Amino acid sequence: MAGCCSVLGSFLFEYDTPRIVLIRSRKVGLMNRVVQLLILAYVIGWVFVWEKGYQETDSVVSSVTTKAKGVAVTNTSQLGFRIWDVADYVVPAQEENSLFIMTNMIVTVNQTQGTCPEIPDKTSICDSDANCTLGSSDTHSSGIGTGRCVPFNASVKTCEVAAWCPVENDAGVPTPAFLKAAENFTLLVKNNIWYPKFNFSKRNILPNITTSYLKSCIYNARTDPFCPIFRLGQIVADAGHSFQEMAVEGGIMGIQIKWDCNLDRAASHCLPRYSFRRLDTRDLEHNVSPGYNFRFAKYYRDLAGNEQRTLTKAYGIRFDIIVFGKAGKFDIIPTMINVGSGLALLGVATVLCDVIVLYCMKKRYYYRDKKYKYVEDYEQGLSGEMNQ
């Protein structure tokens, strides 16, 4: 208890003030200068040169539009001879910061609403009506069960459903991809950026790009790094994947546009940098529900006025355009803050040297005696002398 009171009394009634002591020691002097040089190197090299601590920064605000071009031809028993242009394989026509290119499909033509046998699987195969439930439906059903067991073909019976008939059979994905020629389609990406804090705007179609150049150029990281037109096959290849393999079941590709701009330099130095990566990277050891697909339908009426539709299960590659970056420009406030922080860090050298001199060196008691001078309360000493 007495020890606690002594510590509390020392804390409340004692005051220490810095005392400058010049210590002639090569070790301590050299260590002090080395620490100071390291701190200066950090402040100048890292904070100001590398991180540009003298600049105010702002994040990019971006808008993106895309346009695909390319024509393909197919000739199949189901669809016959057919030409595919942009209006056929870009579904939907417009998306926000992305574009879907259909590369493969399962087409079910001339569907009408009625009753028909379900596709055979472990839940739909039956022997009699007793195996089928009226009104049954689950997430994998093509329609609503009628309770009847009907022939699917000469050897198999399945439960009948009320649905769009004939029901879709998506058991096998076409290989190779139906629109494998999409590898040579091109994609124009138009990107406008704005840094609101500095009221600076620019677009990826640079001022030196002419109309004739834009009609003929294709992006190449070495020869045409600022051409905004990309060949789809090259995008996938630059990400380290095969377009023909990806086109079968689809996937998602990221086109990354990086804008890092130093606005203390001329605006012509603010340039886009493109990179590519697959966003739905496949795990070969756990390949469940791979790729990217969805369904859409085209509705029409036959000569008798009955509604029909053609259902398409579309597989393809969705290209997501991801824009990021920051801009910096000189500002006195962050400059002074970082200068002040650097000066404060120089005090670390003094603290470190004090710890070594006063607690680690052989002559620490001698140095401690020179460093600290203990002075009694002058008023108490004076009153004691008067009482005597």
Swiss-Prot record:
Q: Which GO terms describe its cellular component?
A: apical part of cell; lysosomal membrane; plasma membrane; postsynapse
Subcellular location per the Swiss-Prot or TrEMBL entry: Cell membrane; Lysosome membrane
Please list the GO biological process terms of this entry: calcium ion transmembrane transport; calcium ion transport; cellular response to ATP; cellular response to zinc ion; excitatory postsynaptic potential; nitric oxide biosynthetic process; vasodilation
Q: Which UniProt keywords apply?
A: ATP-binding, Cell membrane, Disulfide bond, Glycoprotein, Ion channel, Ion transport, Ligand-gated ion channel, Lysosome, Membrane, Nucleotide-binding, Receptor, Transmembrane, Transmembrane helix, Transport
Q: Where are the membrane-spanning stretches? A: 34-54, 339-359
Question: 4Fe-4S as a keyword?
Answer: no
This entry's Gene Ontology molecular function terms read: ATP binding; ATP-gated ion channel activity; extracellularly ATP-gated monoatomic cation channel activity; ligand-gated monoatomic cation channel activity; purinergic nucleotide receptor activity
| Positions bearing carbohydrate | 75, 110, 131, 153, 184, 199, 208
Per the record, ranges on the Cytoplasmic side are: 1-33, 360-388
Main subcellular location of this protein, as a coarse class = membrane
Protein residues bound to CTP: 67, 69, 186, 293, 295, 313
What does this protein's UniProt record list under function?
A: ATP-gated nonselective transmembrane cation channel permeable to potassium, sodium and calcium. CTP, but not GTP or UTP, functions as a weak affinity agonist for P2RX4. Activated by extracellularly released ATP, it plays multiple role in immunity and central nervous system physiology. Plays a key role in initial steps of T-cell activation and Ca(2+) microdomain formation. Also participates in basal T-cell activity without TCR/CD3 stimulation. Promotes the differentiation and activation of Th17 cells via expression of retinoic acid-related orphan receptor C/RORC.
What family does this belong to? Belongs to the P2X receptor family.
Q: What is this protein called?
A: P2X purinoceptor 4
- Species of origin reads Mus musculus (Mouse)
